[in-house]
Amino acid sequence: GVSFHVGSGAEDPKSFVKAVEDSRFVFDQAAEVGFDLKVLDVGGGFSEDTFERFAATLSDALDEYFPPHIRIIAEPGRI
């Protein structure tokens, strides 16, 4: 699978959208050479103040770029 960590203290939820888009690209590249990736591990960047907003943005991006059979692991980091 693929893992990304946006980083603690992220201030722009679009950084998660970009990370999901980049992950989709990696999944597609892997498929082109015969790998069937099944896991996406997302993490970092969430704080108590931004958790709700960032989680909603991340959820929307995951729905747009990944089918339901992909296993998503979320590691929010320090909250």
UniProtKB/Swiss-Prot annotation:
Compartments where found: Cytoplasm
InterPro entries in the record: De-COase2_CS (IPR022657), De-COase2_N (IPR022644), Orn_de-COase (IPR002433), PLP-binding_barrel (IPR029066)
Entry GO terms, CC: cytoplasm
Broad class of where this protein is predominantly found: cytoplasm
Pathway assignment: Amine and polyamine biosynthesis; putrescine biosynthesis via L-ornithine pathway; putrescine from L-ornithine: step 1/1
PROSITE patterns: ODR_DC_2_2 (PS00879)
Cofactor(s) this protein cannot do without: pyridoxal 5'-phosphate
Catalysed reaction equations from the record: L-ornithine + H(+) = putrescine + CO2
One Pfam entry name: Orn_Arg_deC_N
Coiled-coil stretches noted in the UniProt entry, renumbered to this chain: none
GO molecular function, one term: ornithine decarboxylase activity
Activity regulation details: Inhibited by antizyme (AZ) OAZ1 in response to polyamine levels. AZ inhibits the assembly of the functional homodimer by binding to ODC monomers and targeting them for ubiquitin-independent proteolytic destruction by the 26S proteasome.
Record-marked site positions (Stacks against the aromatic ring of pyridoxal phosphate and stabilizes reaction intermediates): H5
EC class: lyase
EC number(s) recorded for this UniProt protein: 4.1.1.17
Keywords: Cytoplasm, Decarboxylase, Lyase, Polyamine biosynthesis, Pyridoxal phosphate
Binding site for pyridoxal 5'-phosphate: S8, G45, E75, P76, G77, R78
Highest rank taxon of the organism: Eukaryota
Family: Belongs to the Orn/Lys/Arg decarboxylase class-II family.
Job of this protein: Catalyzes the first and rate-limiting step of polyamine biosynthesis that converts ornithine into putrescine, which is the precursor for the polyamines, spermidine and spermine. Polyamines are essential for cell proliferation and are implicated in cellular processes, ranging from DNA replication to apoptosis.
Assembly information from the UniProt record: Homodimer. Only the dimer is catalytically active, as the active sites are constructed of residues from both monomers.
The name this protein goes by in its record: Ornithine decarboxylase
